[in-house]
């Protein structure tokens, strides 16, 4: 096979894998992991069921790859939202980024919500999700420490729980959820003088 043919073949494989991942992502976000079958994914992607197993060992492996990709997307923006020496600006940026993601990527949040709420059913995901959550809490703890919070770890855990709760409610209630008002309330809660946090 010529280098040109190899490049074309690699491009086709990559496009096919992206199509499979996009179809799986959409179906699992809409209907849930357990209800969505490999046949459903194959049909939505316009490929054979057997072809899916060329790229993924199992449906669980496919879910794992989807979650890793979703988490990777979030990590790519972290340097830009943390690009300030002022911890209050960074915390503000994190909160704004979170709400922006809820508005712009609702399917991703539905998928992540299902996975995080059912980690007991997806033990293969537990370590990945737990490690990421610990990392996010550690980042927020560092910011809250600089802002003068008396218990920065406790407050970071509270903030993570608030964000999780908002995410779940937004996914469940959808259009009726007052995202703008909740965002403003959360921004107001975490702005102000360090002395007020003790």
Question: What are these regions, as identified by a protein language model?
Answer:
Residues 1-15, 197-198:
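N-terminal intrinsically disordered/low-complexity leader segments
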Residues 12-25, 41, 66-70, 74, ...:
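Generic hydrophobic, amphipathic alpha-helix propensity
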Residues 16, 59, 66, 70, ...:
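Hydrophobic/aromatic residues within well-ordered alpha-helical segments
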Residues 19, 23-61, 65:
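Helix-turn-helix
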Residues 65, 79-104, 146, 152, ...:
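Hydrophobic alpha-helical connector segments
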Residues 80-81, 96-103, 112-121, 189:
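Helix-loop "lid/cap" segments that line or gate small-molecule binding pockets
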Residues 104-107, 121-147, 154-157, 184:
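Amphipathic alpha-helical packing segments from all-alpha helical-bundle domains
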Residues 151-172, 181-189:
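Hydrophobic alpha-helical segments that form the core
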């Amino acid at each position: 096979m010529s280098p040109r043919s190899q490049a074309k073949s690699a491009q086709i494989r990559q496009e096919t894998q992206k199509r499979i991942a996009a179809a799986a992502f959409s179906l699992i976000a809409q209907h849930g992991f357990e209800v969505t079958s490999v046949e459903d994914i194959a049909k939505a992607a316009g490929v054979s069921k057997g072809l899916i197993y060329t790229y993924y060992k199992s449906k669980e492996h496919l879910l794992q790859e989807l979650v890793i990709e979703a988490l990777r997307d979030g990590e790519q923006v972290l340097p830009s939202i943390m690009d300030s020496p002022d911890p209050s600006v960074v915390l503000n940026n994190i909160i704004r980024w979170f709400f922006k993601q809820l508005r712009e990527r609702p399917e991703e949040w539905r998928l992540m919500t299902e996975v995080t709420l059912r980690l007991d059913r997806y033990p293969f995901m537990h370590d990945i999700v737990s490690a990421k959550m610990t990392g996010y809490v550690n980042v927020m703890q560092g910011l809250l420490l600089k802002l003068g919070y008396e218990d920065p770890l406790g407050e970071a855990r509270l903030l993570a729980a608030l964000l999780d709760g908002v995410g779940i409610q937004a996914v469940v209630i959808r259009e009726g959820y007052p995202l703008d008002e909740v965002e403003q309330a959360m921004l107001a809660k975490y702005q102000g003088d360090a002395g007020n946090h003790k």
